[in-house]
Amino acid sequence: MPDTIIVGGGLCGLALAKSLQERGQDFTLYEARERMGGRIFSERCQRNNLAVDLGPTWFWPDTQPRVTRMILSLGLDTFAQHDQGDILRLNTTDEKPEVMELTEVHGGARRVVGGMERLVTAMTAQLPVDRLNLGHTLLSVEEGDDYVILSFRHNERVVQVNARHVVLALPPRLLEEHVLFDPPLNASLREAMRATHTWMADQAKVVVAYDQAFWRESGQSGNAFVTHEQVVLPEIFDACDATGEQAALGAFFPSHRHCAPPFRPPPWPC
């Protein structure tokens, strides 16, 4: 029976596993997906082989010292998010965008060369393979006499494991919605879990690759904000690689579209 079971192979779960490994403490990690990293996910563009982050992209050394130290300790190269140039705003559909007075958007943010998924790969490489279990979806958490019983769905069957300690490195809202607890959690805790927002959970990302960063050549930063009622991509940013040779623009795409009016395109010329 392992001393500690970690449920969730995102950044939080991996960081805890790495810490326990460095201390020589026993642990086993279970992840529902068939990959580690959680919402950290990088994909290669077919157009120019650029590694783009479809999940977390940036870190801020001034305000996130722990993750900064971890990235540096793993020997990962980083670069500053490109913010130099004009920042645009489009308020109406039939006018040209205006130049904003802002001088930067991302406030000293940096990115990992090759995509943020390199952080996940580097962390996972330091952990024993036999302690990492993919494809295990947590179903229930049951309190035993002096241990905890966890039930997972794995390959269309239910697997039970016991541990002295359990760390649930998952969004509280997902735990409350999908995991059965015995004894049940009290009402106030369940309410708090339901009310805990998962940062950026209602946003998706779109990345478009180009042959060259034409916006930089014209003195623009790549940052733009679209605020009119037919907006599809409200915030756009430069997503090029560290050299600027692999060109791309990224954008946030709100997943909740029920509040926005339907898009009605004008007649397009033939």
Model-identified regions with their sequence ranges:
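FAD-dinucleotide binding site
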Residues: 1-270
